[in-house]
Regions:
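Short cysteine clusters
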Residues: 16, 20-23, 254, 272, ...
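Conserved alpha-helical substructure of the radical SAM core
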Residues: 1-121, 366
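Flexible mid-to-C-terminal extensions adjoining Fe-S/redox cofactors in radical SAM and related proteins
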Residues: 1-7, 26, 30-35, 274-367
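Radical SAM enzyme [4Fe-4S]-AdoMet core and its adjacent flexible, acidic
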Residues: 31-37, 41-49, 97, 129-131, ...
Length: 367
């Protein structure tokens, strides 16, 4: 059985109820639909209820990855997953099979009934996409201030509910100037919430990039870091974020492919949750064993794990997943990593330690 941590299951990535201007799906050439930029079209009706074709594929993907890897974490993301009819029932059914079920959403369709049902499951980590609490900061995600207020009102209900939550805050030339205000607004929600700012990325990201004179804002926040607690990520995360901007890109290693991979609802598998342009195989349409065996065992996988990034996509990449790399590199402790919502479960902690120990034992043998 492979010693991995998480499957990032992407369901209908082009089906969304927002049109974020920097959306990576619209920039992706991974699938024909991405080339057509369907992400900017109106959301479509779909169904993952028991007996549907989509549900059959999802069940197959989860079965294969669970049986062959015993993963403690499943992350379910889109698109916007709650556009899919039957999604809440699917989450309720699969949650008991994992130590942690991560649910990534923009929050617009998450009502009180959903929150109560998610909280009842007891092992949910919400990941909410929000660039800032003001319209100015969130403008690339909201077409107008009225829409932003509607979105933030719904998010306020989510943040107040107490479910462990990570806020994914994309840093761009509109959100970074407002970041201090955003952090001050969010710290009221308490210890169940963590904020993870990370740089906008992708081939079309230049127009959204943080301006050079905005970068010192990150160091200003660093100098008063404790004033934004308890919602801040581990300190090493902020240090690495500042380094990314000051060095104009990634110059440090990435260990993410040692921990996680991506599956799409059509069965395709990729080596890294942050890179969608490399297909390992398909666990729905192909024989399963060779595809599973290829996860972590391809030349492309080794390129991703180079001491310094070799691909342009990697050089421009820094995401909340980077806490895993910091753990492997000794920049944060296991306790610090497991203080964040996604990694708190005991079974997750155990798997993290296993992967860490296995890697460093191998490194000793190579010396």
């Amino acid at each position: 059985m492979k010693n991995l941590l998480a499957n990032d299951l992407v369901i209908q990535e082009e089906n969304c109820n927002l049109s974020c201007k920097y959306c990576l799906t619209g920039q992706s050439s991974y699938k024909e639909g991405h080339l057509d930029k369907l992400i900017f079209q109106p959301p479509r009706k779909s169904d993952c209820a028991s007996g549907t074709t989509l549900r059959g594929r999802i069940d197959r993907i989860i079965q294969v990855t669970t049986e062959n890897m015993g993963l403690p974490i499943l992350k379910v993301t889109g698109g916007e997953i709650f556009l899919v009819r039957g999604m809440m029932e699917l989450l309720e059914e699969i949650a008991p099979r994992f130590a942690t079920l991560v649910v990534q959403t923009n929050g617009v369709l998450v009502n009180r009934d959903y929150l109560e049902r998610l909280a009842k499951l007891g092992n949910i980590c919400l990941q909410i996409s929000l660039d800032g609490t003001s319209y100015e900061a969130n403008a690339y995600r909201s077409n107008n201030s009225e829409l932003h207020q509607k979105i933030y009102s719904r998010l306020d209900n989510i943040f107040s509910f107490g479910i462990p939550t990570e806020i994914y805050c994309v840093l761009n030339n509109r959100s970074l100037p407002e970041l201090q205000n955003t952090l001050n607004d969010l710290k009221q929600y308490g210890e169940h919430l963590s904020v993870f700012p990370f740089p906008v990325r992708g081939p079309d990201s230049e127009q959204f990039q943080v301006k050079p004179d905005q970068i010192p804002i990150l160091r200003s926040i660093w100098e008063t870091y404790d004033s934004f607690q308890p919602i801040m990520p581990p300190r090493a995360y902020w240090q690495r974020l500042m380094r990314f901007y000051e060095e104009k890109g990634r110059n440090f290693s990435c260990h993410l492919p040692r921990f996680a991979f991506t599956t799409f609802d059509d069965g395709f598998v990729t080596s890294c949750p942050n890179i969608w342009f490399n297909k390992i195989g398909n666990v729905v349409t192909q024989e399963v064993e060779p595809v599973v065996e290829s996860i972590g065992n391809t030349p492309f996988h080794q390129i991703l794990l180079a001491p310094k990034p070799r691909l342009d996509a990697c050089k421009g990449c820094f995401t909340p997943w980077d806490t895993l790399s910091m753990f492997m590199d000794g920049e944060i402790t296991l306790d610090e990593l497991c203080s964040t919502p996604m990694y708190r479960a005991p079974a997750v902690r155990q798997r993290l330690q296993e992967i860490y120990s296995e890697y460093w034992e191998t490194q000793k043998c190579l010396v």
